[in-house]
Amino acid sequence: MSKGWRKLFVSRGDGTKNSLKKTLKVPEVRSPLLTNFHRWAGKERVLKLTDKEQVTEAVGNSSWDLSKNLFANLLASPMRSDKASRFKFPRDLLIQMKLVQTGNENPGKLATLMPLINMKSGKSSSYVANSLKIFKGKKPGLGQLVPTAVNDSGIANISLSDIVLDKSLFTEKHQEELLQCIENCMTQLVDRRKSSVPVVVEDWDVVLTYDHNNDNDIELVRLKQLPKDPTVIILNLKVVENDSIRALINDKLKNHEVGVVLKFLKDERLIRLVYSLLNFSK
């Protein structure tokens, strides 16, 4: 056999070097959808439609009343990284943690890692999923949740050994503080409701209940028995097993046959607190 027999398997034409088959290469993908997608998290994306007809075609004639929608407002909050999982979530679905200067009750310690019920601005914050189960487990350790930046906390040259890491602050005590804030808001609402007019249930209203016959804590329901079949968010507080809360919801605050009807734009703080407690307690 001739010496050029190998060329028979790769050659075209006359079998010369110039006619050898070249190895095909797949072009490198340059689409930002694939190369830069991980960089988009946390950045606001605005759909800019300047023409009125374009807007109508995209979203219809209704704005869907998203400003009154609890879920829409939660999802619209800025993205933050969960310190435990490293995934990003809307901030209002997480617990914010800060280092707070310690008083005389903890000698030798400079700061305490605290969960915050009311979120505060500042760089010295970290976030973790709003879940009691996470803190009752062995992982993550609280040391992993300490904010990286402590520059604006008023504490300089701090190390992990200088920080009080008390798990009870993130479990029973956090739950108790949430419940106390909810009860305070409800008590204030009792005085406000004394002179209020009869309520009309509308889309995206939040209905508070204390119903052991309902297995769901959070549910989206269309009330077909009411005019215009409004879609409402029901938050059932039976999980707290608290007589004061039960009396407030089933007696003092009840303003409709379906329960305590709240309007997001008027009762936003109470609604957010209840939703946070229910999510935390699951």
Swiss-Prot record:
Keyword list, A-Z: Mitochondrion
Protein's UniProt keywords contain Mitochondrion: yes
Annotated Gene Ontology cellular component terms: mitochondrion
Subcellular location(s) of the protein: Mitochondrion
Keyword Mitochondrion (UniProt): yes
GO biological process: mitochondrial genome maintenance
Similarity section: Belongs to the RRG8 family.
Task of the protein: Required for respiratory activity and maintenance and expression of the mitochondrial genome.
Protein name per its UniProtKB record: Required for respiratory growth protein 8, mitochondrial
Species annotation: Kluyveromyces lactis (strain ATCC 8585 / CBS 2359 / DSM 70799 / NBRC 1267 / NRRL Y-1140 / WM37) (Yeast)
